[in-house]
A protein has these predicted regions:
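Conserved mixed alpha/beta catalytic, RNA-binding, or beta-rich assembly cores of soluble enzyme
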Residues: 1-38, 51-59, 100-121
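Short, charge-patterned binding micro-sites
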Residues: 40-44
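Mid-chain, well-packed structural core segment of small domains
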Residues: 45-89
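C-terminal edge-of-domain segments
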Residues: 72-121
Length: 121
């Protein structure tokens, strides 16, 4: 599992915040699971879970396109945080969006794959 957080401070764009959360998760971690098991990175199954206050406002195709390899599925949940912003006069000017992302990575392994790993020890 890889975790990240992203924001859109001034644009109130949920997709931008979600994409930044996925980029953040990728920068802090490594999707090195597949090569460690002698598989291709394209064999990985990646589920991206995004938490934002308005899940319906996230364009999932843009979020999925961030991952460089593997099959991708995006699941949206209500979460994250919207923080109101005020201008110099104290009037509301919009809000800052905080999105959370979790990337769940799975790899299908056969018994032969596991046996090969055991022999390599």
């Amino acid at each position: 599992m890889e975790l990240g957080m992203g924001t859109d401070i001034t644009g109130s764009d949920y997709t931008k915040a979600a994409c930044r959360a996925v980029f953040n998760a990728l920068r802090q971690n490594s999707l090195a699971l597949a090569p460690a098991f002698g598989k291709s990175r394209d064999d990985m199954h990646c589920e991206i879970v995004i938490g934002v206050q308005r899940p319906d406002a996230v364009r999932t195709d843009e979020v999925a396109a961030i991952l460089p390899y593997g099959t991708r599925e995006v699941r949206l949940e209500k979460g994250g945080l919207d923080t109101p912003r005020e201008g110099p006069d104290g009037e509301p000017t919009g809000f800052t969006i905080l999105a959370n992302a979790a990337i769940l990575v799975r790899l299908d392994l056969t018994q032969d794959d596991l046996d090969r790993l055991e022999q390599a020890k």
